From Swiss-Prot:
The keyword Hydrolase does not apply. A motif ('HIGH' region) lies at residues 104-114. This is Glutamate--tRNA ligase. GO terms for cellular component: cytosol. It catalyses: tRNA(Glu) + L-glutamate + ATP = L-glutamyl-tRNA(Glu) + AMP + diphosphate. Catalyzes the attachment of glutamate to tRNA(Glu) in a two-step reaction: glutamate is first activated by ATP to form Glu-AMP and then transferred to the acceptor end of tRNA(Glu). It is found in: Cytoplasm. Pfam families: tRNA-synt_1c, tRNA-synt_1c_C. One of its GO terms (molecular function) is glutamate-tRNA ligase activity. NCBIfam families: gltX_arch, PRK04156.1. It comes from the Archaea. GO terms for biological process: amide biosynthetic process; glutamyl-tRNA aminoacylation.
Length: 562
């Protein structure tokens, strides 16, 4: 299917799901998700996709649906089939009216743990022909200061995972919205400015008693709020609290903090600088936005249950109806460092292959399809679940095996002279079944090639070996003068009765550095044609690796898994 045909399929489907109007960004994302090989040409294909999107948007709804059913009927069912595989029906869901969101904090790069709510929320929105929102929750410039580069990085990671979004928001640019609702809340008597010292407040809270500011008239509260907004209070001198139940069994729920002062002259926000000093907490901003953005279903981890309780008080004060909230169990990822703080301490950058960031996993060689499949298989179970490196590797192998070039690589190399009466030729396919092409090597009589020392030791015991796709050789010993092993030509055709090992070999070798994340880097000799490859390779008998570039005629590889 060419680019125009792919674009037509996904533009029609996107228009069908969204009232007849296709959006360019999600169509581009869908095209690249179906044909990842087009990613290097993305700048060239975007004008083509844009032209197709405009063409589709000029069609009537009836015409869009007719063409979609006639030419791409599978597009109407494929997303539903994917979703049914790992996700149960969504409660309180009405087709065409479901709206979900992914709300990352851009204080670090997107991690494997973040991928679960992103993938699941997106899948549900599309399964129910709804909408999906990307919302950056960046309202803490002090303790969770946003990384300027993380905004775009997260968007790139989502696109790579095959996730498109219909709406995009930045909470730091919605401060006036929050201030307006805060005033409304204060006027309704649902919030108040508290200037109690923290120790005094905690004592009152633990005793279930109100602080002196709680019952001040709304008019006085609004005057205090004006003073806070004018900068008359310093950091830590005042907070705004939402009135809840002072006898609530969970003390943290009692009159929780909705806004706090942050000195942005010392802690400027990367997008708004020092413009604002009063910043909403997670529960206020997230709760307000879920309502104003029309989010119908919030899917998040079980540790957010307390936040749901807090937000229920906010909604009650404002007369709003809560969205359907689904809490799934904890996800333990064995063999990965997921803590953002630990990754920072270790000095991991966003695409460090040792880190469990989406960028790191991508660079290491994990395919987006594998990550999606694993997360969908875990789903929204309320019980805790665990994913091991082996789980992810098994799914990844299913995806990449057909795309991985088979490469001969020799670690602990030893030279071997081939004693043959005439030149020998070998044609080796890059893949045994997938038609990825081949390469040819010609070996002259007496030419030296490189084998693994362990293979030569076994050849000594067995009397010989077979060089892959070349010929069978007898083991003739070691020439001390030349410092080479001697192998004598025996026959061309494969002869299983001999019981020889079939081993890899390298002629005119190039160097390769193989990085096993978390371990040492090792050196190997590889066949020269390997330096032209991109993407995945399978180092024969060793495992899969991702090409990480070529430097000074040396191939850099990141070892992936067996």
């Amino acid at each position: 299917m060419d680019v125009r045909e792919l674009a037509l399929k996904h533009a029609l489907r996107n228009a069908y799901l969204h009232g007849g109007k296709a959006q360019l960004k999600p169509v581009v994302t869908a095209v690249l998700a179906e044909s990842p090989e087009l990613r290097p040409k993305v700048k060239e294909i975007i004008p083509i996709i844009k032209e197709v999107v405009e063409e589709v948007n000029r069609m009537s709804l009836e015409e869009q649906e007719r063409i979609l059913k006639e030419r791409f009927p599978e597009a109407l069912e494929e997303r539903k089939k994917e979703t049914r595989k790992g996700l149960p029906p969504l409660p309180n869901a009405e087709r065409g009216k479901v709206k979900t969101r992914f709300a990352p904090n851009p204080d670090f790069y997107m991690t494997l743990g973040n991928a679960r709510p992103a993938i699941i929320s997106y899948e549900y929105a599309k399964a129910y022909e709804g909408r999906f929102v990307l919302r950056f929750e960046d309202t803490d410039p002090r303790t969770k200061r946003p990384l300027p580069e993380a905004y775009e990085a997260i968007k790139e990671d989502l696109s790579w995972l095959g996730i498109g979004w219909d709406e995009e928001y930045y909470q730091s640019q919605r401060m006036e919205v929050y201030y307006g609702l805060l005033r409304e809340l204060v006027r309704r008597g649902g919030a108040y400015v508290c200037t109690c010292p923290p120790e005094e407040w905690r004592k009152l809270r633990d005793e279930g008693k109100p602080c002196p500011h709680r019952d001040l008239p709304p008019e006085e509260q609004e005057e205090l709020l004006d003073q806070v907004l004018e900068g008359k209070f310093g950091e830590g001198e005042a907070v705004v609290r939402v009135k809840t139940d002072l006898r609530h069994p969970d003390p943290s729920v009692r009159d929780w903090v909705a806004f706090r002062i942050i000195d942005t002259s010392k802690h400027p926000h990367p997008l708004t600088g020092d413009k604002y000093v009063l910043w909403p907490t997670y529960n206020f901003a997230a709760g307000v936005d879920d309502y104003l953005m029309g989010i119908t279903h919030v899917l998040r981890a079980r540790e957010h249950r307390q936040n749901t309780v807090k937000q229920e008080f906010l909604y009650k004060h404002l007369g709003w109806t809560m969205p359907t909230v689904i809490h799934f169990g904890r996800l333990k990822l064995e063999g990965f460092v997921l803590s953002k703080s630990k990754m920072r301490e270790a000095g991991f950058k966003g695409d460090d292959p040792r880190a469990a960031t989406i960028r790191g996993l991508r660079r290491r060689g994990f395919a987006p399809e594998a990550i999606r499949e694993v997360m969908l298989s875990v789903g929204i179970k309320s019980s805790d679940a665990s994913i091991s490196f082996a789980n992810l590797a098994a799914e990844n192998k299913k995806v990449i095996d057909k795309k991985a070039y088979r490469v001969m690589a020799v670690e602990d190399p030893a030279p071997a002279k081939l004693l043959a009466p005439e030149p020998l030729e070998a044609e080796l396919p890059w893949h045994p079944t997938e038609g990825l092409g081949s390469r040819k090597y010609s070996v002259e009589p007496g030419e030296v090639v490189y084998l693994e020392r362990a293979d030569l030791r076994r050849a000594k015991r067995r009397g010989g070996l077979r060089l892959m796709e070349l010929a069978n050789f007898k083991y003739k010993g070691f020439d001390e003068d030349e410092g080479v092993y001697l192998l004598e030509f025996e026959s061309k055709e494969l002869d299983k009765e001999k019981g020889y090992d079939i081993v890899q070999w390298v002629k005119d070798p190039k160097g390769a550095i193989v990085w096993r994340p978390g371990e040492r880097k090792s050196f190997a000799l590889v066949e020269p044609e390997a330096l032209k490859l991109e993407g995945w390779v399978q180092l024969i008998r060793k495992g899969y690796a991702k090409v990480d570039g070529v430097e000074e005629d040396t191939l850099n590889l990141i070892y992936l898994h067996e």
